[in-house]
């Protein structure tokens, strides 16, 4: 039978999703736990690979097994053997025609960014950070240049293995949430005389696209932040896109605040569409 799993993880301690000789990847730990629970070797295929330091709220994998076990048994049994920062959220038997990657019609990511004169501490590794205030309107205007089908070569890592740089970005939303009074007081007390006042807040960038190139979201983030800080005008994003050269774009931004929200499937597969942890993001 074929089984699909929804997996959530904090990627800080791991070398990304895909199995490596080091054994310190999410896939390595998941397959080891599944193997111990099933008492046999288990090989998984995922909806979308994530890089070192990137988190996953609902990575979807599938595997084939001769064992017929209840969904709750796969969840609880596998989690028994997983480290505390990786957990199976749900399990569901699926038809043999289901493929976690090939059946996905889109993929979704979120980037959570802290704007504050004080670097994150408790949230270290879970949010990106900028010291300077960002212009939301400028970033919104820049983001509109990226919507639709484009050649995203300018936002592609040199080691990207995708067959084509042409992808479709369906949605890029940018929202802001103010931090609490304590954060505002801390921000004010850390400013030097003469510094411009800055509100402490969280920016949330959500991406939905047909598929994503290696480092594509982080490279777009680098450009959006450069525009938000006033280094470039919003129209610069179109110039970067048209250049089709990685050299034209801003540096790759930190992986810390990047979350793979999960794939999008046709409702007929009957799989959960969103992780409960989605509502916990700032």
Curated annotation (Swiss-Prot):
A matching Pfam family: PseudoU_synth_1
Organism taxonomic ancestry: Bacteria, Pseudomonadati, Pseudomonadota, Betaproteobacteria, Burkholderiales
EC number, UniProt record: 5.4.99.12
Protein's UniProt name: tRNA pseudouridine synthase A
GO molecular-function terms, A-Z: RNA binding; tRNA pseudouridine(38-40) synthase activity
Disulfide bonding pattern of the chain: none
Description of how the protein assembles with itself and partners: Homodimer.
Residues binding substrate: 109
CDD domains to which the protein is assigned, alphabetical: PseudoU_synth_EcTruA (cd02570)
InterPro entries: PsdUridine_synth_cat_dom_sf (IPR020103), PsdUridine_synth_TruA (IPR001406), PsdUridine_synth_TruA_a/b_dom (IPR020097), PsdUridine_synth_TruA_C (IPR020095), TruA/RsuA/RluB/E/F_N (IPR020094)
Provenance organism: Delftia acidovorans (strain DSM 14801 / SPH-1)
Residues at the catalytic site: 51 (nucleophile)
The reaction(s) this protein catalyses: uridine(38/39/40) in tRNA = pseudouridine(38/39/40) in tRNA
């Amino acid at each position: 039978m074929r089984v699909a799993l929804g997996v959530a993880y904090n990627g800080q301690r791991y070398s990304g999703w895909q199995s490596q000789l080091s054994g310190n990847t999410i896939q390595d730990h998941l397959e080891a736990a599944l193997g111990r629970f099933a008492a046999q070797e288990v090989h998984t295929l995922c909806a979308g690979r994530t890089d070192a330091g990137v988190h996953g709220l609902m990575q979807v994998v599938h595997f084939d097994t001769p064992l017929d076990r209840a969904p709750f048994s796969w969840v609880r049994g596998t989690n028994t053997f997983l480290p505390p920062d990786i957990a199976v959220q749900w399990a569901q038997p699926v038809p043999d025609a289901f493929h976690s990657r090939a059946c996905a019609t889109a993929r979704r990511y979120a980037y959570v960014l802290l704007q504050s004169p004080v670097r994150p501490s408790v949230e270290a590794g879970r949010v990106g950070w900028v010291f300077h205030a960002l212009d939301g309107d400028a970033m919104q205007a820049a983001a509109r240049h990226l919507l639709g089908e484009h050649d995203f070569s300018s936002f592609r890592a040199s080691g990207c293995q995708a067959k084509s740089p042409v992808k479709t970005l369906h949605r890029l939303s940018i929202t802001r949430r103010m931090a609490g009074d304590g954060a505002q007081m801390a921000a004010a007390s850390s400013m030097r005389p003469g510094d411009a006042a800055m509100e402490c807040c969280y920016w949330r960038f959500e991406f939905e696209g047909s598929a994503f190139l290696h480092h594509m979201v982080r490279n777009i983030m680098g450009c959006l932040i450069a525009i938000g800080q006033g280094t470039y005008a919003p129209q610069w994003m179109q110039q970067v896109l048209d250049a089709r050269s990685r050299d034209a774009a801003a540096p790759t931004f930190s992986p810390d605040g990047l979350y793979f929200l999960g794939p999008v499937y046709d409702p007929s597969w009957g799989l959960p569409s969103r992780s409960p942890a989605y509502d916990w993001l700032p």
